[in-house]
């Protein structure tokens, strides 16, 4: 993947404004609420019976922060995302048996949450374009083991 200077700047600037203690948990909770079939991969997390239960679930929040940590690693090494995510791809494919389409669903929820936080001025079409390109590269890296 080739990144323009403008794309790199937009992604890094947006990331610098995000609070990983908020975005990750919020995006994962949104994914579990909006796409309830994704909950089957989180059965060990306890009460996921309602949106309020999901939003208040500490295990969901903790895993959301883990997701954000993974994104941080990708941002720090944007030219090597496939290698960065290779072990995660193997784990999600071979150990956890996660449906690879769920990565895209979560990426969409991350985008929605970022857009809601920053609004049209902070999440302009140019920023969105760069951010979605970045998340698409991450999703494809996570799906790599499935092919």
From Swiss-Prot:
Metal-binding listed as a keyword: yes
One cellular-component annotation, GO: haptoglobin-hemoglobin complex
Domain Globin intervals: 2-147
GO molecular function: haptoglobin binding; heme binding; metal ion binding; organic acid binding; oxygen binding; oxygen carrier activity; peroxidase activity
Binding site for heme b: 63, 92
Tissues where the protein occurs: Red blood cells.
CDD domains documented for this protein: Hb-beta-like
Keyword Magnesium listed: no
InterPro entries (UniProt xref): Globin, Globin-like_sf, Globin/Proto, Hemoglobin_b, Hemoglobin_oxygen_transport
GO BP, one annotated term: hydrogen peroxide catabolic process
Matches recorded under PROSITE patterns: GLOBIN
Keywords: Heme, Iron, Metal-binding, Oxygen transport, Transport
Pfam families in the cross-refs: Globin
Described function: Involved in oxygen transport from gills to the various peripheral tissues.
Similarity remark: Belongs to the globin family.
Record note on quaternary structure: Heterotetramer of two alpha chains and two beta chains.
Protein name in UniProt: Hemoglobin subunit beta-A/B
UniProt lineage: Eukaryota, Metazoa, Chordata, Craniata, Vertebrata
